[in-house]
């Protein structure tokens, strides 16, 4: 009897457990079926990826929808109840965009650094130029020990100011100096004197061939005068020396400045008072020509 009662109680308990399962709503059963179908679909998709890698791009995900209406996600994963979501790091253009941004930032930083270094170098060069200019303008100043820029050396190469060059142009160097008390004569007179064959070049105190008659007449002045000519005396102050281009000395008598004729012809056609009046050495110092060019300087003086 005890065994029969225990068997009846176990059957009643089993029946009570099966009763709630049979009383479940059809919605729960449909949801459970969808879950099982989804699991089966994922299993088949996984099998496709493992055994058929070339067909992995055809993977579609079955997502449960609203009111037991599932949908497929061709790209991405199930997101919410009606959409498909994809993470940014899963997109190829996401990484491309970041790569472009990083490269552009590096280029900008490199150009900024180069521009900064160039500006610093220009500023240093400008400061060095200013220091050199002030040192050259104000003369030698205190130079720090071990300085690579010697301002005292640069002051020697200071160019003149623009106003000084415009208003005071550079003058040629002075000509050969002469002894005091001897007036200057122009190079044109010496050139005319040599072109008329009134004098010739002699080195170291030789006599002039053109005035040989006057030189020979000098001894006769103490005795009798020559026939046909009045005694003419050439004063020592009316003869001068002229330096030639071959480092020689040419002795020339002073020509007549008014007519431009040699002194020999003037003596032959004029008297002694006329020669003294028209002699350029007897003229006042104001009427004497200006200083000749360098290298043709000459002076009236005694013959050495």
UniProtKB/Swiss-Prot annotation:
Decide whether keyword Transmembrane helix is in the record: no
User: What domain of life does the native source organism fall in?
Assistant: Eukaryota
In what ranges is there compositional bias, type Polar residues? 209-218
Keywords on record: Repeat
InterPro entries reported in the protein's UniProt record: WBP1-like, WW_domain-binding
Motif PPxY motif 1 extends across: 159-162
- Asked if the keyword Repeat belongs to this entry, the reply reads yes
Region annotation (Disordered) ranges: 1-26, 206-235, 252-304
Q: What Pfam families is this protein classified in?
A: WBP-1
GO MF annotation terms: WW domain binding
Which N-terminal stretch is annotated as signal sequence? none
For the motif PPxY motif 2, give the residue ranges: 172-176
What is annotated about its quaternary structure and interactions? Binds to the WW domain of YAP1, WWP1 and WWP2. Interacts with WWOX. Interacts with NEDD4.
The domain comment in this protein's record states: The PPxY motif 2 mediates interaction with WWOX. Both PPxY motifs mediate interaction with NEDD4.
Alphabetical list of PANTHER family matching this protein: VESICULAR, OVEREXPRESSED IN CANCER, PROSURVIVAL PROTEIN 1, WW DOMAIN-BINDING PROTEIN 1
Instruction: Write the protein's name.
Output: WW domain-binding protein 1
The gene is Wbp1
